[in-house]
Amino acid sequence: MPDCTAAPFISHACFFFLQCTVSPLVERFAFPKNLTRGKRLRVICTVTEGDLPIEVEWWKDGLKIGGSNPASAKFGSQGIQVRRIDEYTSLLAISFLETTHAGNYSCVASNSVASFSRSATLTIRGEFIDLKLEIPRFH
C-alpha cells in the first residue's frame, strides 16, 4: 500500500514498501545403511534458505510425527522424538530401532510463502533366525 506524504515545496511524494520473502529450502538428508533392531538413530533436517518464521515438521508415511490426531500421536509411544534445535534445524531421534520404524520420512519446512520437503526411506534389516522344525511322525 503506498504511503503518501506532502511537503511544502512538493505537490506529493509516494513511497512504496516492497517486502520479498524467501521460501524455505531443505538440505538433503539420508539414513545410514545396515541399520538393525536395537540401534539408535539421529537425523538432522536443516533449512538452508528461507525467511523466518519457519515451521519445521517431520512426517512418517504421510502422518505428522507429534501431530494432535490419534494416528500420529502413536509415534511418541514408539520412541520417535522430534526436537527443535534452532530456527533452522530439527532433530529426528529414535532411541531403540524396531522394524516398525521402517518407512518413508519427510522433513517439511514452511513459511508464509511456501512449503518445501525432502524425503528418505528408513530400512531396518531384520534378524535371521534359523529354525529347525521337527515334524512328528504318526505311525
Predicted regions and their residues:
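Immunoglobulin-superfamily
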Residues: 1-4, 11-139
